[in-house]
């Protein structure tokens, strides 16, 4: 029986991405549903982590055309470069675009968000600097570089799905090139292994 795609749904205990900061306060990314707030880890963060942990980015080559982008050419394409499996847009000369062969949803918490704010500062560093300058960190905190900050912390069970397009793996239609069956299978296995052992801590 021919299978065109593979989908798996994952439940894992993980931290969240951070979104916009207000002053020295960093807040986690959230989604609103049924009048409740749920923390999340973005699909972009998950995808990057999977590409790194699977080893897909080990052969990544980049170029600069206004912004850094993945290097693509007739000699270097998704059929022979695993780093391009997650999709690319290259604008050097002729513009080439290839969609990713695997897709992720955001990882959304199973339970609604309960804020846990953590407070920190760089007191030790500021005290060291104040001592060198002969000033008091208590009375001249600003001059000593004392900086208190706080951030929301969240680690909870989150749910996400990944779908792999088995017909697209290892294929680059921009250059009419395609990897062999063994290479395609190795890429799929690498993605699944990465999900199983994925680092579930993210900051920033």
Predicted regions: what is each one?
Residues 1-204:
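RNA-binding basic/glycine-rich loop and surface signature characteristic of RAMP-family CRISPR effectors
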């Amino acid at each position: 029986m021919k299978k065109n795609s593979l989908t798996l749904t994952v439940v894992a205990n993980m931290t969240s991405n951070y979104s916009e900061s207000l002053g020295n306060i960093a807040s986690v990314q959230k989604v609103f549903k049924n009048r409740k707030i749920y923390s999340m880890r973005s699909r972009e963060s998950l995808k990057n982590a999977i590409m790194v942990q699977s080893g897909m980015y080990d052969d990544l080559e980049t170029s600069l055309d206004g912004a850094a982008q993945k290097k693509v050419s007739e000699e270097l394409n998704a059929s022979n470069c695993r780093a391009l499996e997650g999709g690319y847009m290259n604008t050097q000369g002729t513009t080439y675009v290839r969609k990713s062969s695997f897709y992720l949803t955001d990882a959304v918490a199973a339970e609604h968000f309960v804020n846990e704010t953590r407070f920190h500062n760089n007191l030790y560093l500021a005290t060291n600097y104040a001592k060198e300058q002969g000033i008091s960190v208590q009375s001249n905190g600003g001059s000593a570089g004392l900086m208190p900050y706080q951030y929301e912390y969240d680690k909870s069970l989150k749910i996400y799905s990944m779908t792999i397009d088995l017909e697209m793996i290892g294929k680059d239609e921009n250059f009419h090139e395609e990897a062999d069956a063994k290479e395609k299978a190795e890429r799929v296995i690498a993605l699944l292994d990465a999900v199983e052992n994925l680092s579930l801590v993210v900051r920033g």
